[in-house]
């Protein structure tokens, strides 16, 4: 059985990930990140994720609302060497839900299905998962 460090906004930085690995975590997540940041401001995304010299496996959780942007961001993350890509479909935080992301995606299951299908087409090597509450 594998042990995962979950993505925690404000906490899952490089230091915590290294500590959790030292204590036996098999897979560690970065903090969740907006797909728009990965696409439009890749330097900022790399700085936030701190995965340049990361040990593997490394996992990233994406949030967003547009299938085209989420799938493009997933492709970019895979090219950066990310081993696991997770779609956030559970975050109840008001500003995430207001942007039609996180748990708001559950309001329109056909749209969610479209997102999943498009992301799967872009992800070739990384493992894909969905966070839901």
Name the predicted role of every residue range.
Residues 1-4:
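Extreme N-terminal starter segment of soluble prokaryotic enzymes
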Residues 7, 71-80, 89, 107, ...:
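Conserved alpha/beta-domain cores
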Residues 8-83:
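Glycine-rich, positively charged N-terminal anion/phosphate-binding segment
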Residues 29, 84-86, 129-131:
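Generic enzyme active-site microenvironment
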Residues 32-43, 89-109:
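Glycine-rich, proline-tolerant flexible connector loops at the mouths of alpha/beta enzymes
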Residues 46-61, 103-130:
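Alpha-helix-loop-beta-strand connector modules within alpha/beta enzyme cores
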Residues 61-62, 88-90, 131-133:
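Short beta-strand segments
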